[in-house]
Amino acid sequence: VPLAMTPLLGLLSQPIGAAGMARMPLEVQSLAVWSMINGLGFLIRSVGTAFNEVVVRHAGDRGAERTLSRFALVAGLAGSTVHLTIAVTPVGAWLFRHVGGLSPSLAAVAADAFLFAAALPILAWLMSLWTGLLVHARRTRAISEAVVLFIVGTAFVLVLGAKLDVMPGAIVANV
């Protein structure tokens, strides 16, 4: 898979996620809150996603790998802390209800699902770090393979979630 195709392949997880959620408990509620929790989560981790470009540019600088790694770890932990704070405090309820316009019952589903995605910001920063280091080293095959594995893993988790039928789709899709 060419490196240029990996973002497109990554986008395949969206319809796979929607199809999976539609087959799990609270399917309508999960699909109703998905855009809100996905959008808010992306807003928090988007800087981490863009960090890849910084890593590619500076990976060859003296001492850069250690500095970039430390920065990714600190920034990722900060992003996950913000995410977790939103998930477990009244801030999240306020955002889901008043900014997102969700009903109280949908806001509760959103808050539960959002909590399960608290690790995604730090993972985005670390993934950008590792991807940037691989691109800088011109070892991009692993990136394409990882994206394919991500899609297969996503499909597997969603099929398993639908078969087990014990957890709302919005939560399973965030795992």
Where are these regions (language model features)?
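Short membrane-interface helical motifs at transmembrane helix boundaries
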Residues: T81-D112
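Helix-terminus/linker motif at the lipid-water interface of multi-pass membrane proteins
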Residues: A4-L43, R97-G101
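Helix-loop interface residues and adjacent transmembrane-helix termini in multi-pass membrane transporters
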Residues: P25-V28, R62, H136-A137, K163-L164
